[in-house]
Amino acid sequence: MTQSRSTPTKPATPETPNIPSADKWQASLFEAMAVLRNQTSPRFDVLLKRGTMSVEVYAPQKQDHQTPHRQDELYIIQSGAGIFSRDGQRSPCRAGDVLLVPAGMDHRFEDFTDDFVTWVIFWGPDGGEAA
């Protein structure tokens, strides 16, 4: 049996990203980037979702206007480089880096390159998991 790699339930718009079906188990960065090319800010796409977990791709342009999220999250930098600001601390980041942000913490990417793309993984309950 062949599993569809990308079968969103509805077309993505800047206000409403793709929401994948619950049985989707594989995603493609190339397919996500094709969706993002047609979006303006914010540029992100939900690739996989199961329970509280979601896998997304995020490619900000010029500025990152994020606000704190209700869930814990991981960023896995796919391409590019920049500065990651997290709870008042700033650190360089680049392709291959993994960054952890607890739920509710102020964070954003700054001074990033034009080719900056990151995977985003959200999981856990509202308010995050216990430390």
Model-derived features with residue positions:
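A short, N-terminal "cap"/entry segment at the start of jelly-roll beta-barrel domains
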Residues: 1-57, 62-66
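Short strand-coil-strand connectors
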Residues: 49-51, 85-89, 112
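A structure-centric signal for secondary-structure junctions around beta-strands
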Residues: 52, 71, 115-116
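Short hydrophobic/aromatic-rich beta-strand segments that constitute the beta-sheet cores
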Residues: 55-56, 84-86, 118
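Short, conserved beta-strand element in jelly-roll/cupin
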Residues: 69-84
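A generic "structured core" feature
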Residues: 72, 98-100, 122
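Short acidic-glycine-tyrosine-enriched beta hairpin
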Residues: 88-103
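Ligand-binding loop in jelly-roll beta-barrel domains
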Residues: 103-129
